[in-house]
Regions:
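Conserved helicase RecA-like core
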Residues: 1-173
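Intrinsically disordered, Lys/Arg-rich low-complexity segments
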Residues: 173-200
Length: 200
């Protein structure tokens, strides 16, 4: 419902992991292995992104399936059923394909891509922290997604905790807050030359 678009559950811990875009898959694999998650629902922005990520997980023997609009209804139902029955560890989904997914006791929801529409964040993570259980909403954020992250924080009226993962510290830093001067993009390196040539 529209009234709940900016509400997130009290039982959800939110974590932002700043990381360079090119290393997102590597970081996700590291988290899955080190945190020993039983299962997790992972959101990507595009169908192609969902397929690509699922193949990367398969390569390192993480049992996963992808669901999106290009999959047949039958394929989607089978993947969902396998996930509900603990036959697969990771379900990679797009926002559209995930509509109507009802999985009880989902401990982790991971935003591999920051949603372009802030209220989709609320819908995505609403699948964890149910029934009195604690849940985790983990978002991998690259520097170019900072504006989208700020939109989410404004919507839910909450500053989300940034946690850098050792070995995955980003070259392009995700700022804590908007800079008054847009030229200072707060990067360690990579944007310096371009910034010098920009006027305002």
């Amino acid at each position: 419902s529209v009234t709940n678009d900016n509400e997130t559950g009290e039982n959800i811990n939110h974590y932002i992991h700043p990381v360079d875009k090119s290393r997102k898959a590597e970081l996700l694999i590291e988290l899955i292995k080190t945190k020993k998650w039983d299962q997790a629902l992972v959101f990507t922005r595009t169908k192609h992104g969902a397929d690509r990520l699922q193949k990367q997980l398969d390569k390192v023997n993480i049992n996963s399936k992808a669901i999106h609009g290009n999959k047949t209804q039958n394929n989607r139902m089978k993947a969902l059923e396998a996930f509900k029955n603990n036959k697969i560890q990771i379900l990679v989904a797009t926002d559209v394909a995930a509509r109507g997914i009802d999985i009880k006791r989902m401990s982790q929801v991971i935003n591999f891509d920051v949603p372009t529409v802030a209220k989709d964040y609320v819908h995505r993570i609403g699948r964890t922290g149910r029934g009195g259980d604690m849940g985790e909403a983990i978002t991998l954020v690259s520097a170019d997604e900072f504006r989208l992250l700020r939109d989410i924080e404004k919507l839910i009226n909450k500053k989300l905790e940034r946690v850098e993962i050792e070995g995955f510290e980003p070259e392009h830093v995700v700022p804590i807050k908007d800079k008054p001067n847009k030229k200072r993009f707060h990067n360690k390196k990579g944007f310096k030359k371009r910034n010098k040539s920009r006027k305002g």
